[in-house]
Amino acid sequence: MPEWIEPSLKARNGWPDWREALARIHADPADAKARERLAYDEVFANQLALLLVRGEARSKRGRALQGDGRLRDALKLPYSPTGAQARTMREIEGDMAQIQPMLRLLQGDVGSGKTLVALMALLIAAEADAQGALLAPTEILARQHFDNLGRMLAGLDVRIAILTGRDKGKVREATLMGVASGEIDILIGTHAIFQEGVTYKDLGLVVVDEQHRFGVAERMMLQAKAAVPPHLLVMTATPIPRTLQLASHGEMDVSKLDEMPPGREPIQTTVISEDKLDAVIAGLGRHLDAGKQAYWVCPLVEESEKSDLQAAEARAVTLTARFGDKVGLVHGRMKGPEKDAVMARFAAGELGVLVATTVIEVGVDVPNATLIVIEHADRFGLAQLHQLRGRVGRGGGQSHCILLRGNGLSETSRARLGLMRDTTDGFVIAERDLELRGAGELLGTRQSGEQTFRLATPDSLASLIVSANADARLLEDQDRALKTERGQAARMALYLFERDAAVGLLRAG
């Protein structure tokens, strides 16, 4: 079989040929050089596929969208944008003024003001007489965006609408007609906004919220949806270490919101032994008596024989015995409408405590919830703990996060909880998480819906990504169409590692 690895790289690392590597790994799964060679191949296929997606997007002519500023100037903001917001808005405005479609990833910690940046981008599209779409991963988040943007746009000549899988009948028809006629400027919704039957008059910008629910394949599908590829802005509240950006977003430019709006009180985090559970519950009672709300997070849905973790159902029973009908429960096995109904009651203040598994991780906004208790915090990864903590601290005043830990912690768990106590900076936490857990595990848990690496060991993945990225760039520079002998071999690597959608792009191009 022809070789797709650059010969000097293969020789330098002492790697066997592909067939020999396969034979050796079958004979001895612990064969380090054979495994490293195959792991590199998988990462190389990932990097090459992303570069091809980027090249394809860059080669397509989109349309330049230049706003005249009339809508942005009319927006009455109660505060000035942060320096990071202003810088990012300039980057986006510059991208959208180009004929190549924007492909930009916006990373911003919880509360850093991504929504305002997204709104400004959507207003540029509206000023240029194009439509914008905002895609959210869940119905709750879509409705939250719709309500927030509706308030911010009050009094402006901008028409917004919402479309989710649950909208039926005349309401849905009216929305579809408004989108098709161009009467609606901004459409907000779940994946329903890109299903068949939804036709845009002139889609110029797509904003995707909470990127880790939305993989490379979906990004490619979006690019294919419009006759002229729209500009694409992708937002994530989970900071991504630079190495992992190459693996999951290698085709995108990156902006960072790395400062918080003034006046935000940092969340105070305390690590407490689960032996003191009764004292924590007593503290929760005082918190509720003060008219505040709280989240209580449990890691698993049901007790399993293998696990001594406290189930959410059992904790809800304990808290209900103490606080009565102020306690609600949401978990991953509930149906969407059922979950939404409980969340809506919590948001409306009818419930004081929301007991949850990690389904509250993404984006829910209840400013009166100023306490979060996370049970068995030592069983969660850093990025997930940070995301969960970000559910509080969304209003004025001080918020608190209590991390309940087991006894007999490992060194890694101790380091994790100590870091959570000492910093609220998501970018610091993301880099440290990479050191503590390794890239493979981090990618696997974060990028749901995105291909996980199967062969690379967590501690070797970061260096493999850097090396494979350089090699894939070299090949793409020399042989964009993958027509040479090495290019043909690289096509085979894309097929073998299930990245053949990228080969389809080559054929189409």
What are these regions (language model features)?
Residues 1-76, 445:
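Upstream accessory/linker segments immediately N-terminal to the RecA-like ATPase cores of bacterial MutS
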Residues 2-3, 31, 49-60, 98-102, ...:
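Intrinsically disordered or highly flexible coil/loop and linker segments, enriched in small
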Residues 2-4, 22-27, 68-72, 126-129, ...:
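Short acidic (Asp/Glu) and glycine-rich catalytic loops that position anionic groups and cofactors
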Residues 60-61, 87, 100-419, 481:
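Inter-lobe coupling/hinge segments of SF2-like helicase ATPases
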Residues 63-107:
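Conserved pre-motif I regulatory segment
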Residues 344-354, 362-367, 372-375, 390, ...:
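Accessory helical-bundle/CTD segments and flexible terminal tails appended to RecA-like ATPase motors
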